[in-house]
């Protein structure tokens, strides 16, 4: 069972949570540190905290033990209107937005892929794809110090988009549909770690939407100077589904050799 998490300070997350609560109904509940808590009619916890979502490293301490992982309803800040899904972590020496340096949160490839595919279908049905890019993001920000996997689903990129009823409806419908139908039927032709590409990784996103791939952590070109064998091993170890492939996208020779050595060490397919 997953738990739906949001920050009460976040207009995108809290607005989407309100719609989910209206559509599914449920009973009020109480959990430590939670400012809002609903046990939805489908048995899923919908929980809001005062802390910003990037600082939720305490989730394992306050959520019931039978929760398998977390889906965070969140805003996204960036350049253009987007509907995004990503894993969290700090693949480098700095952690300005939550979590710890050199630390990756547990990844949930099957859930991330299922959410992205459903998000695109819903966005198409609602007529949003002409305005919004539906995309994965590379791994970034906190929280990182969790034992169970976490996936962020987001509305971007400014307050104008965060508060729109249609974007919140799209996120809410995506999550509800995923829980009702797609959670048990997500297929992964490959489970991959992604290396290279931009922060909004076109190649890796296409692999999910068009080729049936599911992704663990994605290391964008902006963090490749920090990439080490230890980070790749951490991504491998902290992935709920078994990784079988490393996908490269326009990486320098040093990184290509590092990826090759990593893939050979763990018996993974290397795809360029």
From Swiss-Prot:
Keyword Chloroplast: no
Family as reported in the entry's similarity comment: Belongs to the DtdA deacylase family.
Function: D-aminoacyl-tRNA deacylase with broad substrate specificity. By recycling D-aminoacyl-tRNA to D-amino acids and free tRNA molecules, this enzyme counteracts the toxicity associated with the formation of D-aminoacyl-tRNA entities in vivo.
EC number: 3.1.1.96
Name of the protein: D-aminoacyl-tRNA deacylase
BP-aspect Gene Ontology terms: D-amino acid catabolic process
SUPFAM superfamilies xrefs: AF0625-like
UniProt xrefs under Pfam families: tRNA_deacylase (PF04414)
Organism name: Hyperthermus butylicus (strain DSM 5456 / JCM 9403 / PLM1-5)
Signal peptide: none
One Gene Ontology MF term: D-aminoacyl-tRNA deacylase activity
Reactions the enzyme catalyzes: a D-aminoacyl-tRNA + H2O = a tRNA + a D-alpha-amino acid + H(+); glycyl-tRNA(Ala) + H2O = tRNA(Ala) + glycine + H(+)
Enzyme class: hydrolase
Assembly: Monomer.
Cofactor note text: Binds 2 Zn(2+) ions per subunit.
Cofactor(s) of this protein: Zn(2+)
């Amino acid at each position: 069972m997953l738990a739906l998490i949001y920050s009460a300070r976040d207009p995108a997350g809290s607005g989407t949570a309100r719609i989910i609560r209206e559509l599914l109904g449920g009973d009020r509940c109480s959990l430590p540190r939670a400012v809002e808590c609903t046990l939805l009619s489908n048995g899923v916890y919908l929980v809001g905290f005062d802390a910003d979502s990037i600082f939720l490293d305490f989730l394992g301490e306050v959520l019931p033990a039978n929760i398998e992982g977390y889906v965070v309803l969140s805003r996204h800040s960036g350049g253009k209107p987007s509907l995004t899904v990503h894993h969290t972590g700090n693949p480098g020496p700095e952690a300005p937005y939550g979590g710890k340096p050199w630390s990756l949160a547990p990844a949930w490839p099957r859930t991330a892929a299922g959410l992205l595919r459903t998000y695109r279908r819903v966005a198409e049905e609602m007529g949003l794809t002409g305005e919004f890019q539906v995309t994965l993001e590379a791994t970034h920000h906190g929280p990182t110090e969790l034992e169970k996997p976490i996936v962020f689903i987001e509305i971007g990129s400014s307050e104008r988009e965060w508060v729109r009823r249609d974007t919140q409806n799209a996120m809410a419908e995506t999550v509800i549909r995923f829980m009702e139908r797609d959670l048990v039927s997500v297929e992964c032709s490959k489970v991959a770690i992604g290396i290279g590409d931009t922060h909004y990784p076109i190649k890796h996103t296409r692999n999910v939407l068009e080729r049936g791939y599911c992704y663990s952590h994605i290391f964008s070109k902006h963090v490749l100077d920090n990439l080490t064998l230890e980070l790749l091993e951490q991504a491998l170890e902290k992935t709920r589904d078994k990784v079988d492939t490393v996908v490269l996208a326009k990486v320098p020779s040093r990184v290509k050799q590092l990826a090759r050595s990593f893939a050979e060490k763990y018996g993974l397919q290397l795809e360029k």
